[in-house]
Amino acid sequence: MRKLLLATSFFVLALSTDIFSANKPQAGTKEQPAAIIQTTMGDLNCVLFPKAAPLGTKNFIELAKGTKDWKDPRTGQTKHGVPLYDNTTFHRIIPDFMIQGGDPSGTGAGEIGIKFKNETLSNLGFDHPGRLAYANAGPDTNGSQFFITEAAYPSLNGNYTIFGQCDDASVALVKKIAREPRGRNDKPNTPIIIKHIKIDEGTH
């Protein structure tokens, strides 16, 4: 079973500009929800992009809330009404690049029985730190695993679905997490746990 790995090439593509950036935490609304990723090292605050990535955003919200069924890769059992991300880990951390999590197996190779197509836009690229995107094992193999970048990384453009943007304080936390001691396959020596992902869709 192939692990969901990201290309680490430093080949630089032309930068694109877009309006999707966040300097500070933003409250969620029905039109643009926000995700608060609560970890054992602090909270990551990210706005989501339902217009740019409707499939990816919907999938993330439903898995976070537990309103979408998924298969536990450790047991093969179908989970119903269970938030997928609770008590999972960031299983891969790379300084100057990103942190990756969202696999219930904690290995990067877990299959949850969900795959959906890539959603990429020419004006939405990895030209900002703090991009929230799906990891994949090739085109149209998105599931639950996601990564957050700590720097602009335009060589990823067009290959991964960006569905959110984390604020500056969250990028600082990503950098801190990415520099934790790590071992084989860039796995942290001490587990960095995602305790819960809260979805803020406003009050209206």
List each model region and its residues.
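Sec-dependent N-terminal signal peptides
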Residues: 4-13
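Cyclophilin-like peptidyl-prolyl cis-trans isomerases
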Residues: 14-204
